Amino acid sequence: MRRFFVFVVFCGLCVVIGAVPAKPIVKDSVLADGSVVQMVLRGDEFYHYYEQITDCGLRITDYRQQIVERRERAIAKRRMSDTQAERPYMLGRAPHQAERGLAILVEFSDNSFTKVRQNFDDLLNKDGYDYNGATGSAMNYFKDASNGRYVPQFDVFGPYKLDREMSYYGQNDREGLDMHPDQMVVDAVAKLAADSLAGVDFADYDTDNDGNIDNVFIYYAGYGENEGAPEDAVWPHAWEVYDEYVMGQLSYSGKRIKSYACTSELQGSVGSTMCGIGTFCHEFSHVLGLPDFYVTDYGSSHKTLGDWDIMDAGAYLNDGNTPPTYSAHERFYLGWLTPEILKDSGDYVLEELQKSNKAYIITEIGEHNLDGGKPNPNTYFLLENRQKTGWDAYLPGHGMMISKTIYDEDKWYNNVPNNDKNSQGYDIIEADGKAPNGSYGKAGDLFPGTSKITSYVLYAKYLIADIEEVDGVISFSFEEEQEVSVDNEECVFGLISRLNDSELLGVSVGTIVYCYDGVGRLLWRKECVGNSLTFDTPNGLYVLRIIDGENVRVIKGI
C-alpha cells in the first residue's frame, strides 16, 4: 500500500486569506544519496510542503502542532490589526447582476507574457469560450452557477511591465509565504493609473460605493508556484492590501485598493499552455464571499470535498478548463438558490442541478429560515442531483449528492470551515461510507452510485429511500419514521443486547429489517425467517427500521 512520507520543505500561515490548493501533480525528485523518489506538492499559498510517496508507514508528528499554533497566533494578530468594520469576507453576499471586475496583466522586469490581452479577454468574457477544451469563459461559469442572476463583465488592461523582478514579489520568506505579492497589486494599479490611453475610471469598480475598489484581479506572467513552478514564483491567492505592508499610492480619484486576487498566465511549470478559468474562478469566489473547503491549516489530513467542489481541488478539473459548478450549498449561501424544505412523506424527483437550480433542505425540526448567509437552524442537509454534463463533466461520479452543513460564521470568516475532522462545516455524505485520506472523490460517493446504495437515514428519524437514477433524473421517497421505544409496554417489539450480539423480538416471517449506523449509513438488510432476528451488535448508536407488511417502525439501539 502506498503511503505518504512528509518532507516539510517550507511552511507558512493561513488566516482569513483564500488560496487555491496545490495541484496534486506527482514528480520525481533526486535525494542526496542519488536515489529517485516520487513527490507530490501539498498545501496552498500559506502553508505548503512536499510528500514522498512510499511503501512504508513513516511519518513526522512534531510539525503539525507547530503549524496550528502559528496559525492561531496569526488569527489573533489579524483580529487586532483589523480596523475595518466589515469583515473581509462579505458573508452571504448576493452580487449585482452586471457587476464589473478589474483585471490587470503584469509582467516582471525579468519575465514577459507569451499571451496577448485578447487571450485573457476571451478567457474571462467570451460566450462559449472553448480554447484547449474549455467549457466556457469565467463569465459563463458565474452566469450558469447563478442561474442568470450574476453576469459579471471583466475589463482587462495591460500588460504592464513592473520595475521589479519576479522574485521580489514571489520569493518565500522563512515561513513559506510569498514576500510581497500585495506590492505587486499596488505597482500594477499605479501602472494602470498612469496609462492615459487606458482611460480607466476606478469608480466603475466600486459597485457598493463604499470608497473601495471591489476587487483587483492580477494575471502575472509565467507560472504559478501552486503547479510546481520555482519558489520565487507567486502562488495564486486572494487577500487585502494593508498600508503598513506596502509602499506607494493606494487611492485614486477617491477609490482605494483593498481586496485583490491573482493567478498565473500559464499552466504547469513548463510549456506555453495558457491557464484555464479554474484558479481564476476559485480566487474570484473568495471575492464573492466563499471560503476554502480544503484543510487550510494542514494540522490534519482528513478527506474533504476534493474534486467535487471548486473551493477544493475541483478548480483543477480538466486542467482548470472545467471547474465544477457551484453546489447547492454555495448557491444557497450566495442567495442564488432557495431550497425546498423537505418534511412531508411522499415520493420526490430531482432534476439535474445545472438545469433545475433545485435542491431540498432537511433539518431536524423540519423548518428553516431559508437564508443561506445566516441560516437558522445552522445545521442542515441538502439533496441535489449532480450529473457528468456541462461544468460537472469531469466530476468523479454522478447521482444524488447529500451534503451536510454546520454553519459557523467565525469559521467561515477565518477560512477554517473544514479543519475540524469531527465537525466539518461543509462536506458530503459518502454513500459507500468510505472517506480515505488523500482521496479527491470517487464514483461511490453519490447515491445510488457505483455501490448501489439506495437509502439513508438523517437525524435517526428521516428516511430517504428508493433512490433511483434514470436518464439523469433522481427519484426517491421520504418519510418521517415513527420511533418505537423498547421500554414501552405496548410495544410489540423487544430488543435484547448481549456481549457480542443482539436479538430483535416480536417480528414475523417475512419482516424486513434495515440497520443504519449513527450517521445514517445502511449497514445491512435482513429478512426474518422466524419470530426473532439475531445480529452482530454495531458499535455505538444504531437504528433498526422494521417493515412488517404495511407497518413501519424504528428502534434505536446502543
What are these regions (language model features)?
Residues 515-523, 542:
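Short, glycine-anchored, charge-dense loop/turn motifs used at functional sites
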Residues 166-179, 183, 187, 268-275, ...:
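A domain-level signal for the mature, folded cores of soluble proteins
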Residues 88-92, 137-253:
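Active-site-proximal segments of metallohydrolase catalytic domains
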Residues 70-73, 498, 522-538, 549-551:
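Glycine-centered tight-turn motifs at strand-turn-strand junctions
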Residues 31, 114-115, 122, 129-149, ...:
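Non-catalytic C-terminal accessory/binding modules of secreted extracellular proteins
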Residues 484-487, 539-558:
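C-terminal tail/sorting-segment detector
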Residues 218, 278-293, 383:
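Active-site recognition of the HExxH zinc-binding catalytic motif
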Residues 478-503:
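Residue-level detector of functionally pivotal "anchor" positions at catalytic/ligand-binding pockets or at interdomain
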